[in-house]
Amino acid sequence: MAELEAVADDLDALIDDLDYLPGHFHLEMQLNFEPRSPAPQRARDLKLQREGLRQELQLAAAPQRPAVRHLLGAFAFYLEELDEARECFLEVAHEHPGNLNAWANLAHVYGRLGQEEEEEACAARLADLMGLAEEPEAAGDPQLRAARCLAEQGYAHGFDVGCASPEERARGLAAGIALYDKALGYGQQIPMEEKRGWYFTMATLYIRLDGIFLELGSEEQKRLPAFNRTLALLRQVLKSEDPRHRALAWCYLGMLLERKDTFSTTPMGVHDCGYSGTDPLDCFGKAIEIAKNQPPILNRLAKIFYFLGKQDMAIGTCNMALDVLRDPELNWQAYCTRAKIHIRAYLHDLKRAKMGLGGMPDRNHLACAKADLEEVVRVCPGFKAYLDIGQVYYYMGVDAVQELLAVDEAALNQALVFLAKAGESELGATLPELQLLRGKCLRIKGEDANAAACFKRAVELDDAGSSHTDGFGCLLEALLAQWSQAQLSDGELGREVDAWLRRAQDKYPAARLRQELQRVWRGHTDEVLGLARALVAQGRPALVRLLFETMEREGEGASAPRDRRAVSF
């Protein structure tokens, strides 16, 4: 026993002396920490992130593919798909026998599987590659292996799962950048083209970090050094031989030059890098020019333009991709992105119409989105396509003023059919967006009890800290509708409102919840006053006080931040 303890102490001392530690399962990422969310939500988030990574793997340059495969293996591990995780790491080890993370991650998986001999063999191979064996046999430079190991770990921080706040996401991105810096210190002899791939990922992490700083209202001096460095990194990436990196670097440069106006004076990095007179639109134009014959790159650019709110540019880029490759089976991404742009345009106009700031939204947007999504559903159906086309049919079925009246019963029924298909998939069944849409369809059809059940499920599935309070607001409206139609008694309504308001307080930011309650109260004043009387009669004055305090604070709430799932490009 004493001998084993001595060996363990020696191992701990050795690890403490190391400047870096291979593998992904020790990294300080939320992925590796005890989950905060319930198991179904965590599994959903892991699978959604994994789906995005699989698409990334198809586009990634060869030197970056091991980093993507390591993450796919880590996600499979935490989804209890241990055989899949092992295969991911074995694939890297076979293609790149000197990859440190592959052997470290394999050792971790074998340990979990209880295969001690394989675990020890991986550990021995790892020690040899790191130059820690008594008689090292591995050829090659351990410094280069260390550099690539650290770069792969830095890449992983850009795809963390489970961050509960912007501050947590910022810390993770900063940790990823620090690992890349460390990798550059070890990797003096790394080929320049491979380094440019690192610079590209670093610039991406920096841009996301700056976006968080903007969201948090951070001081200029906190943003400035990183902003200037990002410009310098992108200038290096523009020399890359990889057209994808070059095109995206021009696009990111355009984004940064647009952000320079958020500083009181132009950041010095703009002048140092020679971009003093550069117009952001010229940068976007150069990105499109580089990608003009390559649909995968055009599709990525279109997505970025979509997230930036540049809808005309996004539509044009999608059209270019479809001019090159119209087959929806091979280029479904362009159809999906173009449909999303039309849906967003319709929703933007609908919101303005509800506020009395514009006329009726153009329903041609819905027709265009429907046509694109029908092409996708025909050749490669999936829960996302079903959800999107279900959303389109919902808006085709309701009025274009307040979403209160059915104008096309057949469209509403078709929406429910597509949403049911989306819900058949394991992932689709865990999406709050799907339950919210189902509830809205059922509410318009007059099925308030069924609608309320869907809205409850949407609230249950929402992440803690989510800004999407729509499901809770719709639930309150459905409960009030049932009560006004005598489908719920005063006591039942009071208990339901009490229980779900407490749950909402635990889940949503206070300011955002207040805004949602204000919206419901403004639209249903008579019902709310009736609810208040019923609650007083039930001896629930504290709940009444909370409701009326909410109404009195109208206008205090800050604008809602975007949800985590919507900000990643």
Curated annotation (Swiss-Prot):
Stretches that traverse the bilayer: none
- Which Pfam families does this entry report, sorted A to Z? TPR_8
> According to the record, where are the TPR repeats?
66-99, 101-133, 203-237, 260-294, 295-328, 383-418, 432-465
Gene3D superfamilies, per the entry: Tetratricopeptide repeat domain
Keyword Repeat on entry: yes
Q: Which keywords does this Swiss-Prot/TrEMBL entry list?
A: Repeat, TPR repeat
Q: Which SMART domains does this entry report, sorted A to Z?
A: TPR
| InterPro entries in the record | TPR-like_helical_dom_sf (IPR011990), TPR_rpt (IPR019734), TTC22 (IPR042342)
Q: Does the keyword Iron apply?
A: no
Supply the name of the protein: Tetratricopeptide repeat protein 22
* Lineage of source species: Eukaryota, Metazoa, Chordata, Craniata, Vertebrata
Gene that this polypeptide is encoded by: TTC22
